[in-house]
Amino acid sequence: MKPTPAELYANLISSTGEDLQRPGLQGTPARAATAFEYLTSGYKQSVQEVVNDALFPSDSNDMVVVRDIELFSLCEHHMLPFIGKAHVGYIPTGKVLGLSKVARIIDMYARRLQIQEQLTHQVASTIAEVTGAAGVGVIIEAKHLCMMMRGVEKQNSVMKTSAMLGSFRANLSTRSEFLALLNN
């Protein structure tokens, strides 16, 4: 029979020589398993469930920007967190996405094992697909604990990734407007 996640955590902790019966570690394997399940809960969600018909008709074709959306994810290489914020912009063509759904799309993908570059593109392509937007821009900036706690141990480094689709890629003035709105 396959071991439970809590049993796997117990084995991992025991492999360090720790005593699972000491007061500070009693229950830790179960808590760690519950935390990991939450941190990877994006695998159990679909775009359809997250968006949940929150697309609304709109005559606006002006840029929509949501910035400073907090996020956390687990790097697929070391399973250590990266923590940061996302900035999303899009140009609607007849419909707009409910504001909270932008954040929920980010959370759905962030709660999976992956890399920041992939997360950025997943968010951009999903918003483009769901809204039919003329263009989408996504920028994510994050600190990676895999670089801060181990390896080169650089605590002040920030990684920035971007995905520009449609008019955000093809039109310099659209991209410039997006970047200017992020800096105000």
Swiss-Prot record:
InterPro entries: GTP-CH-I_C/QueF (IPR043133), GTP-CH-I_N (IPR043134), GTP_CycHdrlase_I (IPR001474), GTP_CycHdrlase_I_CS (IPR018234), GTP_CycHdrlase_I_dom (IPR020602)
Positions bound to Zn(2+): 75, 78, 146
Enzyme class: hydrolase
Pfam short name (any one): GTP_cyclohydroI
EC number assigned by the record: 3.5.4.16
Domain of life the protein comes from: Bacteria
GO biological process, one term: tetrahydrobiopterin biosynthetic process
GO molecular function terms listed in the Swiss-Prot or TrEMBL record: GTP binding; GTP cyclohydrolase I activity; zinc ion binding
Matches recorded under PROSITE patterns: GTP_CYCLOHYDROL_1_1
Gene Ontology, cellular component aspect: cytoplasm
Keywords from the named record: GTP-binding, Hydrolase, Metal-binding, Nucleotide-binding, One-carbon metabolism, Zinc
Pathway the protein acts in: Cofactor biosynthesis; 7,8-dihydroneopterin triphosphate biosynthesis; 7,8-dihydroneopterin triphosphate from GTP: step 1/1
Keyword Secreted attached: no
Catalysed transformations (reactions): GTP + H2O = 7,8-dihydroneopterin 3'-triphosphate + formate + H(+)
Oligomeric form and interacting partners: Homomer.
Family (UniProt): Belongs to the GTP cyclohydrolase I family.
Name of the protein described by the UniProt record: GTP cyclohydrolase 1
Phylogenetic lineage: Bacteria, Pseudomonadati, Pseudomonadota, Gammaproteobacteria, Cellvibrionales
Primary gene name: folE
